[in-house]
Amino acid sequence: MSADDLILHYFEDIKEGQSASLAKTISESDIYLFAGLSMDTNPAHVNEDYAQTTVFKTRIAHGMLSAGFISAVLGTRLPGPGAIYVNQSLKFKAPVRIGDTVTATVTVTGLVPEKKFVTFRTTCTVAGKVVIEGEATVMVPARG
């Protein structure tokens, strides 16, 4: 992603119902890189032999890897650069596997003008199925 891909929405420009999305296909490398960065080396993510003994029968991506795509949308698309996370709730609904394409979407659900806060419904889907849902509050830059 380059600087040309960044989209900035000032608080005054944001309206309820606005939404933005990003999609990423999960690779084996993504899982190993995330495991290294997060120090979460749970074998359900990094060891296929172990993962085959789990309810999922194969390795699954870290939930927070997919949740990170929500942060990417908020920081690069809506509201965009300068947005600061205040709060995020997440509910993990289904696993994400290697090869799945995760689409993270944020939709404006409320505005708090005195604090320049925006609330969002946040979701991640795979093939139209919700795998993560939640709500975020973000502080957004104002024009003035």
Swiss-Prot record:
Residues 13-128 form the MaoC-like domain. CDD domains: R_hydratase. InterPro entries: HotDog_dom_sf, MaoC-like_dom, UPF0336/Enoyl-CoA_hydratase. Pfam families: MaoC_dehydratas. Coiled coil: none annotated. Keywords: Fatty acid metabolism, Lipid metabolism, Lyase. It catalyses: a (3R)-3-hydroxyacyl-CoA = a (2E)-enoyl-CoA + H2O. It comes from the Bacteria. One of its GO terms (molecular function) is hydro-lyase activity. Its EC number is 4.2.1.119. One of its GO terms (biological process) is fatty acid biosynthetic process. Homotetramer. Catalyzes the hydration of trans-2-enoyl-CoAs with a chain-length of 4-6 carbon atoms, forming the corresponding (3R)-3-hydroxyacyl-CoAs, which can then be utilized for the production of polyhydroxyalkanoates (PHA) polymers. Cannot use trans-2,3-octenoyl-CoA as substrate. This is (R)-specific enoyl-CoA hydratase. It comes from Rhodospirillum rubrum (strain ATCC 11170 / ATH 1.1.1 / DSM 467 / LMG 4362 / NCIMB 8255 / S1).
